[in-house]
Structures are given as structure tokens and as C-alpha cells.
């Protein structure tokens, strides 16, 4: 069991977010670092699943659909966090609170909003 969820940032999430979260001690991988730029949302989520990472995105509509599809088909993911576009520092703070409040197992298969 992992205590903290490891994150995968979709390409629409700023690289600054990775820097801010790493400074707080969280394991973060960006789509850019992974060579996953220009991949569609299903591919992004599938990649996060392969790496056993929770995906962070600003793309609410597409990931709500993907989450529902995973549930219907009995597939599992490591969590989807939909983040409203806001100040990077505030968003990093909110993610930090969430990650310090829930274990990786508690985030698994959840669609969370911050």
C-alpha cells in the first residue's frame, strides 16, 4: 500500500505545478517529461494507469466521461483529479491538502474535484 498518491500531470496542467508539488515532497511526472504530448485523453489516462499514478487535469468533461467508462467496464484507475484553473500556488496548496488527507488507496478509482 502506498501512503501518498504519485501524480501524472496531463499536458494542460502547467509544468510550474510539477515544480511546486515536488517542492512539497510529492512524486510528480508531467506529460511533457513522459513524451506524451499531443496524446488524446484516453491515452493519457491509460498511461497513468500503467504507471500507477493519479492523473491531474483541467479537462473536466472528457475525464468525467472516461471515469464513467472505466466504472461501467470494470476497469480501474489510480484516481482522477480535476483541477479548476486558478492561481498555480493556490492549486498546489489544494492538491497538497488533498494528497495529505487521502491515501493512494483512498484516491483509487475516484473522480475528485479541487
Predicted regions and their residues:
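N-terminal start-of-chain detector that recognizes signal peptides
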Residues: 1, 26-28, 51-57, 83-86
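Acidic, PIN/NYN-like endoribonuclease modules and their adjacent C-terminal/linker elements
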Residues: 1-11, 15, 20-23, 36, ...
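Conserved BB-loop
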Residues: 27-39
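Acidic, metal-binding active-site segment of PIN/NYN-like and related structure-specific nucleases
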Residues: 41, 49, 53-66
